[in-house]
Structures are given as structure tokens and as C-alpha cells.
């Protein structure tokens, strides 16, 4: 049984750096490159939580800036292994918001090219070693303990993270719960899924005929400020599917995670709106008021899927960075490029100027045991029974 522990985030305390981040958080020294710029001179204003879903085409990247200026970049991907286009787009955008090239945290949701890029060429590597970004802490999943159909990108990142070159990023394995990310300004941040929360067997299964897809190991996280709840989960899978011909298998981790997340206001849609994610159980538990899809025009995967769009617009306002699959009817969805959430009080918030009000109740730890009531072992079971969506893959998965 797994429970979420959420505590108020406090001011960042990270290694010393060439210059302070906008809110006083510190990023690491020893990063290649100069000219980091003056933090706080960008578009972000003190007192505001901003979450920027950057339109970088096929590459996914999200920038979080807390009311006190601590920053976190979630992913920075590329469309191809030999590309640095995504990194250049992300780097310029981040500088425009922060006014500098200092990041308190970088979070890698999982090791797919479109989320992290290829070391030595693009993505996060390019931001640090070519653009001179300084990073206080790099958080990632345990790719040495859990490995499936990750391919060359996973292998390259494993090698890179073991090199002296990666020390500049201060890498650290993410763990369930709160504490590793301290954004300050009344913002709480907790990991709700890391390496499938033990639902998948540990080991390196890369040589198997249909090992767990890298998406299955995606890191999921819940950010909270006041009444505003925001959920992001990389490309977390929402169905069980074994494809020997494709050389991978998906496992329904969304259903297992849903009970830990409960209601949210804003959902960064997993896997670009794929039909393999955002399942009925997850959406029924979360009931998002706003859903955001980061997707590229011209993608060859059919993202976003019509079925997923239909599920999302049934309960939420939908925003997309690009249209994606031209045959998908977006219904009431809006294509807006960069999708930006802003709030100063954790209640009233805007998405690209459209106004919303956070409707979740303020989460209260009524008995003082460190757990919010939604996942309090004294009051409510957080056990999630996986929906047998296509069955359970007993080869790798813990089945009921």
C-alpha cells in the first residue's frame, strides 16, 4: 500500500552557484558556458506561480516558476537523436521567462528522446553543455534498477549519468512523496509514481521479446498551491497491451496512481493525448477542469487520439500546443502554442488569459499525522485495484 505525503515546500537550499535564481534558489556551479544573465529580469513577476507548457514541436518541456522564483524544468526533448532544435527553443524560452540560465531543478520524466534528448547532441545535455545552463539538482528515475524497451536513448543516458560530465547537474534518483523538490512560496510538490511504484518487476528486460515500455516507468507528480492542484505524469501508460511485433508492452499504471491523486484542477495530458493514456478510471478520479496536450503537427503517431480528446472535453477545457493529428476533431479544444498557467493566490488562475477558479477543497491534515485526508491511512484506503484493461501481464506486473 502506498500513500502520498504532501508537506508545504520551503525555500530551496542547493549548492552555491554563479548567481542566484529569481527567488533565491541556487543552481550548481561548474557548468560549461558563461553569460547566464540576470535572474528576475525576464517576464516572470514575483508573487506568481507560472507553469509554461512550451511549444517545442515533438519535444516536450514544461517550466515551473514558483511565487518566490524557484524554477523547475520538466523534460526538454527532441524530435530526432541528432537534433538540438528542441533544446534551442526551450533554452531561449526559459531565458525569456527567468532572465537567466539558472534552473533550481530539472526533472526527467522518463528516458525517451522526445522528453530528454540524446546526450552529446540535444535536449537537456545541450541546455547545460552548449547553452551554459546551471542546474541545482537533476531528478530522474532509477534506470539502473528498472529497464525495459528504452533503446539507445536509455543506454546513452545511463552512460552519461555515470560520467564525470554529469556531475555538474547533481543527479539524484526521485523517490515517492515530498521533500526532494522545494519550490517555496506556498507550493507543495510530491512524486506520486516513480518506476511504477513497485508494480513492475525490477531488472533489465531489454533483451526480452516484449519488455515494459519506457513510458511505464514515467515519473508522475502532483503540484499544489492553495486550492489549485496540477498533475503531470510524462507518458505514463493507462492500458495493458503486449506487442511482441513492436517489441514492447504497456501496463496500466494510471489506474494504480489514480487513487493517490484524486481531484485535480489542471492535468498535463500524458503521452501527447495517445489512446494508451488518460484512461477512464484516471479521469473519473481526477475530474480535471483543464487539460493540456503538448503535441506536434505532423507527428506519425496519430496524437492526439480522437477517443482521448473526447474523454477530455467531456469534463474539461482543453488546450493544445499544436493540433497534431489532422484527422482528430478537437471539439472545443483550443490550439494556442505555448500554454501558460498563472496564479497568485492558488484559487483564481488563468490559462493563456482565460479565467478559472480552483474548485478543490483545501487539503487538510486533520489528525496531524502528515497525510492529507484523501490518502490518510487512518481515514481512507489508498489502495488502487487495477482495472483489467486488456488483462494483466503477469510476466512483469504484480497482478491481483
Model region roles, listed by residue range:
Residues 35-50, 56, 93, 116-252, ...:
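Flexible, acidic/histidine-containing loops and adjacent segments that form or flank the divalent-metal
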Residues 53-99, 107-130, 195-304:
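Active-site-proximal loop/helix segments of hydrolase catalytic cores
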Residues 1-2, 6-38:
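Ser/Thr-rich, Pro/Gly/Ala-heavy low-complexity intrinsically disordered linkers and tails
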Residues 280, 294-297, 304-308, 320-331, ...:
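Metallocarboxypeptidase
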Residues 362-400:
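Extracellular calcium-associated, cysteine-rich motifs in secreted modular proteins
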